[in-house]
A protein has these predicted regions:
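Nucleotide-activated donor-binding/catalytic signature segment of Leloir-type glycosyltransferases, i.e.
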Residues: 268-298
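A charged, aromatic-enriched C-terminal amphipathic alpha-helix characteristic of glycosyltransferases
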Residues: 71, 378-411
Length: 411
């Protein structure tokens, strides 16, 4: 993933309509508060050799995606060595263990001055990838596109298991890891009991530090979800709950950020639709939710913020999460929240003032939580929720914490 400035320098575009906003916040927090020389290396499409460009405050290295970063790619090791020799870093901060380029750096340059920030953990996520779907449902909904690309929900889950092996190897090799939840702490130490765990919260994109949700300005009975891209986001399960909610609130509306995986209105939808999209179509039709679900397409930070403030409720129905930034963003703005009780999410919702939590499997409980929250939202006092979130995502505080971690590791 390229940060906005890096993308602009490479191809003239700068919108960030994907995950990774925490890295923008972390970089700006460090640069705004400390005199440091910062470089960021990312894989990029459309190039066939290593490229270096200088931004206003950051040096960027673009590594060709080549054969891809979901498998061991020996080319990455030589690129990492070249970058390391050119920039001569005091410390290398690897963001995320989901892809192979972090392991490539450690293999090429060693682990003595490297630290990993845990984002999600594919080695753990893999078992939850298709959670809530039966084998027969998955097989029955294999599409033409799945057959052509030889990529089904089962193979996607298998891909998580394979990438998880590289993640485990990386964590076993490292001496330091940065996390922020009891879940990533437990799973990091389960892999490497000798690794030193450093706690540091994440800084969000600047757009979410201003404005506050107001009941009088929201669209009543409207739910916002940040993604339905993959089964791991749990949208297939949420649809079951929405079917129950609709009996009580007929005008319930669910708006979803990200690409429309159903491709129901796409002229070539039949040939391009993934199996998961077909499953969602099947459920939407089964529960007669065609007029209750709206896919918004990819959104940048300002557009996401608009949808949070517009919604009556934010729901995170994932099968597994560590600390979803979408929950943090919603809380920062004071939006009523419901999330599944999974992974590290419970650390983000310590009390009912900050949101409600429901087990992923409890479809009826989720439906009742949605109905009750919508009915009670007129009287919702979001001051505690906002206060807790702003303390957690305080940019200055998190920059100081991260800088001190860097100094501790270097010394």
């Amino acid at each position: 993933m390229l940060l906005p400035e890096a993308k602009f320098l490479l191809d003239g575009e700068s919108e960030l309509k994907a995950s990774g906003g925490w890295m923008v916040g972390a970089a700006n927090g460090l640069l705004d508060n400390y005199d440091i020389d910062l470089a960021i290396a990312s894989v990029a499409y459309g190039i066939d050799s290593l490229i270096k460009k200088r931004g206003s405050r950051i040096s960027y290295y673009y590594i060709p995606i080549g054969k891809g970063n979901k498998r061991v790619n020996k080319d990455y090791e030589s690129y990492c060595k070249e970058i390391n020799d050119d920039f001569l870093p005091d410390l290398v901060h690897i963001h995320g263990s989901e892809y192979s380029h972090g392991l490539a750096y450690v293999k090429a340059c060693g682990s003595s001055k490297a630290v990993l920030s845990i984002q999600g953990m594919t080695s753990v996520y893999a078992q939850y990838y298709n959670y809530g779907l039966t084998l027969s449902q998955i097989i029955r909904n294999i599409t033409l596109r799945d057959c052509i690309k030889r990529k089904t929900l089962l193979s996607e889950q298998d891909d998580f298991y394979k990438r998880g092996k590289y993640e485990i190897e990386l964590i076993k090799t490292l001496k330091h890891v940065i996390g922020r939840t009891s879940w990533d702490y437990a799973n990091s130490l389960a892999i490497n009991p000798n690794i030193e765990y450093h706690f540091c919260n994440e800084t969000l994109r600047s757009q979410f530090y201003t404005e506050k949700w107001e009941y009088s300005k929201c669209e009543k009975n409207t739910i916002f979800c940040s993604s339905a891209q993959d089964p791991i986001k749990g949208f297939h399960q949420l649809l079951k709950s929405i079917a129950i909610v609709k009996r009580v609130i007929p005008d319930i509306k669910v708006r979803v950020a990200g690409p429309d995986v159903t491709l129901s209105s796409h002229p070539s939808g039949y040939t391009k639709r993934r199996g998961y999209g077909k499953i969602l179509i099947e459920r939407i039709k089964k529960y007669k939710l065609e007029n209750n679900i709206e896919f918004l397409g990819p959104l940048d930070a300002e557009e996401m913020k608009t949808q949070y403030l517009r919604a009556n409720l934010f729901v995170c129905p994932s099968t597994i999460e560590n600390s979803p930034n979408s929950v943090g963003e919603a809380q920062m703005l004071g939006v009523p929240c419901i999330a599944t009780y999974t992974g590290g999410v419970m650390d983000m919702i310590p009390n009912v003032q900050c949101g409600k939590m429901v087990r992923f499997e409890e479809v009826g409980m989720m439906a009742v939580a949605i109905i009750n929250t919508l009915n009670e939202s007129k009287h919702f006092d979001n001051s505690v929720e906002v206060s807790v979130a702003r303390n957690r995502h305080d940019s200055k505080q998190n920059a100081v914490c991260l800088y001190n971690i860097y100094r501790e590791i270097i010394q």
